[in-house]
Amino acid sequence: MSDKTVKSTNLMAFVATKMLERQEDLDTCTEMQVEKMKTSTKARLRTESSFAPRTWEDAIKDGELLFNGTILQAESTTMTPASVEMKGKKFPIDFVPSNIAPIGQNPIYLSPCIPNFDGNVWEATMYHHRGATLTKTMNCNCFQRTIWCHPNPSRMRLSYAFVLYCRNTKKICGYLIAKQVAGIETGIRKCFRCIKSGFVMATDEISLIILQSIKSGAQLDPYWGNETPDIDKTEAYMLSLREAGP
């Protein structure tokens, strides 16, 4: 049994429990989804217990420690408005500005964007990959990776988009057009995987109500604890974006 699988179960146990503690904020469809998530998580726990023995209470406790140890609630209430477009309709995004220390030990976040040959930092390049469109502006290495999610309990769907947000110029330096996932539980699992991979969570006003128990607007710094910036990781990530084109 991999450590990653155990952590995932612990996270789901913690989130399901916390969401059900706030039933007054959930409509019937969402509550049913969370109950289903809790039931499936308990089944996973029983299967895993033969390899990694722990109780339901242990899983909740470990899940809470994992959240509190890696995801920090934003201190600033200042938001930078932006939007993503899905099926011809624009949806607003609220970005939580980065205020995670020790930012001085990660100078790649503070270095200026490098203009291209004609001095234009924001010349967008369009890519098409697996039915999605990626807009990548050039030469920005000071981004924070953001996942925006928008639950729709009435249709039991969750929409999400991946965004690169420049910390220096406070502009979007790249985004992947929003997609829809059938099933809120499935969508939340996808968001969890993205957060654990170093994405920031961004939500709109409606999502704050539904996702507040899983720390809406929380931040996770992929370079947290590094004494020096992980430039190789950054360059590899930017290269992967460029290679995502046709």
Curated annotation (Swiss-Prot):
Keyword Heme: no
UniProt keyword annotation of Cell inner membrane present: no
Role: Prevents the establishment of the cellular antiviral state initiated by host RIGI, which normally triggers the antiviral transduction signal that leads to the activation of type I IFN genes by transcription factors IRF3 and IRF7. Also participates in the up-regulation of the splicing of viral mRNAs.
Family note: Belongs to the influenza C viruses NS1 family.
Secretion signal, residue range per the UniProt entry: none
Taxonomic lineage of the native organism: Viruses, Riboviria, Orthornavirae, Negarnaviricota, Polyploviricotina
A Pfam family per the record: Flu_C_NS1
GO molecular function: RNA binding
Subcellular location per the Swiss-Prot or TrEMBL entry: Host cytoplasm; Host nucleus
Cellular component GO terms held in the UniProt record: host cell cytoplasm; host cell nucleus
Biological process, per Gene Ontology: symbiont-mediated suppression of host cytoplasmic pattern recognition receptor signaling pathway via inhibition of RIG-I activity; symbiont-mediated suppression of host type I interferon-mediated signaling pathway
Keywords: Host cytoplasm, Host nucleus, Host-virus interaction, Inhibition of host innate immune response by virus, Inhibition of host interferon signaling pathway by virus, Inhibition of host RIG-I by virus, Inhibition of host RLR pathway by virus, Interferon antiviral system evasion, RNA-binding, Viral immunoevasion
InterPro entries for this protein: Flu_C_NS1, Flu_C_NS2, NS1
Organism, as annotated: Influenza C virus (strain C/California/1978)
Name of the protein in question: Non-structural protein 1
Main location: host cell
